[in-house]
Curated annotation (Swiss-Prot):
Gene3D superfamilies found in the cross-reference section: 3.30.230.10, GHMP kinase, C-terminal domain (3.30.70.890)
A Pfam family that the UniProt record links to this protein: GHMP_kinases_N
Chain coiled-coil ranges: none
Enzyme kind, highest EC tier: transferase
EC number: 2.7.1.148
Binding site for ATP: P97, I98, G99, A100, G101, L102, A103, G104, G105, S106, S107
Active site (record annotation): K12, D139
General function of this protein: Catalyzes the phosphorylation of the position 2 hydroxy group of 4-diphosphocytidyl-2C-methyl-D-erythritol.
InterPro entries in UniProt: GHMP_kinase_C_dom, GHMP_kinase_C_sf, GHMP_kinase_N_dom, IspE, Ribosomal_Su5_D2-typ_SF, Ribsml_uS5_D2-typ_fold_subgr
Sorted UniProt keywords: ATP-binding, Isoprene biosynthesis, Kinase, Nucleotide-binding, Transferase
Family that this chain belongs to: Belongs to the GHMP kinase family. IspE subfamily.
Gene: ispE
Protein's pathway: Isoprenoid biosynthesis; isopentenyl diphosphate biosynthesis via DXP pathway; isopentenyl diphosphate from 1-deoxy-D-xylulose 5-phosphate: step 3/6
Protein name according to UniProt: 4-diphosphocytidyl-2-C-methyl-D-erythritol kinase
Length: 310
């Protein structure tokens, strides 16, 4: 077994989030495009001889117990391995804001699967890890694969698309005092839009095919930026002052191509032709964001999900 393993866990943004309808299992049928960005957490993992799994974190207030996806991922991987004596010391360095619609928790869980599969020498394939990830969270398989992906079903069914012609830049903002409940956001979507949901697999399949064929996606490029549809934004924004303010500030940034909320929010972002343009726009507006109570980051698209570090 390897002595120590370090893994990065990138955040994601939604370039497209379409709620197609309600499934018989209670979940929503989704058609999404997700993109990894270089705002990332880090996991440092080492073996323990006593068979315990212990998690620590540099983020005060974040639970390190068995409700944390890192702990749950570690426990599931050990259970499936059959080697119940395996133990690990895991330290999580948080950079992705919590409860932000950026899949920080899911990315950490995916990174734990990758890290401990390596640390413990288990030899699970990427597909096996993705199957375990899907048991833990709908967006965890994406967080393992990363890059840019079409995501269908609950979000766990991935299809690769051509890599972007260039790495677009991102300015990302979040008010650290505000969070949005994902179940609430989907419940509001059902309440306000449920009468217009598609109702059968034939209709779902047609919308998936429409998204696969979207000109802006083949490949993604600054000359034809994505429309950034987010059906959850339609219901969250009118009821969340933080999202309204974030989008107004982002829309005022010089050179931005498009703005949107990510996932169920409340994080919002603007796209730029490249990282330099994003850096320069944030430099101009950093004080305005701070005065309005927002944390802000400039980021780039990346072509990977959870990744082993040297």
């Amino acid at each position: 077994m390897t002595a120590t393993v370090r893994v990065t866990a990138p955040a994601k943004i939604n370039l497209h989030l379409e709620v197609l309808g309600q499934r018989s299992d209670g979940f929503h049928e989704l058609a999404m495009v997700m993109q990894s960005i270089d705002l990332a957490d880090q996991l440092d993992c080492s073996n323990r001889a006593d068979g315990l799994i212990q998690l620590s974190c540099d983020q005060p207030g974040l639970s390190c117990g068995n409700d944390n996806l890192v702990f749950r991922a570690a426990a599931l991987l050990r259970q499936r391995s059959g080697f119940h004596e395996l133990g690990a010391q895991i330290h999580l360095r948080k950079r992705i804001p919590i409860g932000a619609g950026l899949a920080g928790g899911s990315s950490d869980g995916a990174a734990a699967l990758l890290a401990l599969n390596t640390l413990w020498g288990l030899g699970h394939t990427h597909d096996h890890l993705c199957a375990m990830a899907a048991e833990l969270g709908s967006d965890m398989p994406f967080c393992l694969a990363g890059g840019i992906q079409l995501c269908f079903g609950r979000g766990e069914c991935l299809e690769s698309v051509p890599a972007a012609e260039q790495s677009l830049g991102v300015v990302l903002v979040k008010n650290p005092t505000v969070s949005v409940s994902t179940p609430w956001a989907y419940g509001e979507c059902r309440r306000l839009k449920g009468d217009h949901y598609l109702s059968d697999e034939v209709a779902f399949a047609q919308r998936r095919q429409d998204l696969r064929a979207a000109s802006w996606l083949n490949p993604l490029r600054a000359a034809e930026p994505p429309p950034l549809r987010n059906d959850l934004q339609d219901v969250v924004e009118p009821q969340t002052a933080s999202v309204q303010m974030a989008l107004r500030l982002l829309q005022d940034l010089p050179g931005q191509l498009r703005t949107a909320m990510s996932g169920s929010g409340p994080s919002c972002f603007a796209l730029f032709p490249n990282r330099l343009d994003a850096d320069q726009a944030l430099d101009v507006a950093r004080d305005s964001f701070a005065q309005a109570g927002f944390d802000a980051w400039s980021c780039s698209f990346v072509g990977h999900g959870a990744k082993l570090m040297p």
